[in-house]
Regions:
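Short beta-strand-plus-loop segments that form exposed binding edges in beta-rich domains
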Residues: 119-127
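Extracellular carbohydrate recognition
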Residues: 126-134
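Glycine-rich, low-complexity segments
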Residues: 2-40, 57, 77, 81-95, ...
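Extracellular Ig-like/FN3 beta-sandwich strand-entry sites
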Residues: 53, 112-116
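Beta-strand-rich interaction surfaces with strong enrichment in secreted/lumenal proteins
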Residues: 33-37, 45-48, 105-109
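Beta-rich globular "head" domains
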Residues: 44-78, 120, 134-140
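Generic, low-specificity signal for short hydrophobic/alpha-helical stretches with a mild N-terminal bias
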Residues: 32, 38-41, 99, 103, ...
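Terminal beta-strand-rich extracellular "head" domains
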Residues: 62-113
Length: 142
């Protein structure tokens, strides 16, 4: 075993058998709003490009103010097409998707290098919209 410098992270990665670098896991945290303003629905609320190719292994969303009256629903798109067959949701009165009654389902896990990623807000709470949305992308590379 040895180590190999990873220019994407600036870290030394474990090198597996035969000199091949072990897979690297990253978590991208994307702020989709400020902390206090009510969320509004819309497409491409956030747009960014993938810094490297990777496999999407999990997604999560959190808010600082919970939606009230209905769930907050978020979609994640690569090049304009959803990567989720069941969208990411935060249930009424909750602050995280980790406890969602219906968890998100990833239908397209392969994210290309430099792919345009957009985050849509499809639904906000009907009484209180929710605020402070962050979306987490769990990515494995290598």
């Amino acid at each position: 075993m040895g180590y190999k410098f990873n220019p994407f992270t600036g870290n030394l990665d474990d090198v597996g058998e035969g000199g091949a670098a072990a897979a690297v896991s990253d978590i991208y945290v994307i702020a989709c709003s400020n902390e206090t303003t009510d969320l509004t629905t819309g497409t491409a609320k956030v747009t960014f490009r993938m810094p490297a190719a990777g496999t999407l292994t999990a997604v999560k969303a959190t808010v600082t103010t919970a939606p009230v009256g209905s769930a907050l629903i978020v979609d994640i798109n690569e090049a304009g097409t959803s990567v989720l067959s069941t969208k990411l949701s935060i249930d009424d009165g909750e602050e995280t998707s980790a406890t969602a009654a219906t968890p998100a389902v990833i239908s397209d896990s392969a994210l290309a290098d430099d792919a345009e990623i957009t985050i849509d807000i499809d639904q906000v709470g009907s009484g209180t919209a929710g605020a402070g949305l962050k979306v987490y992308l769990y990515i494995t590379r290598g």
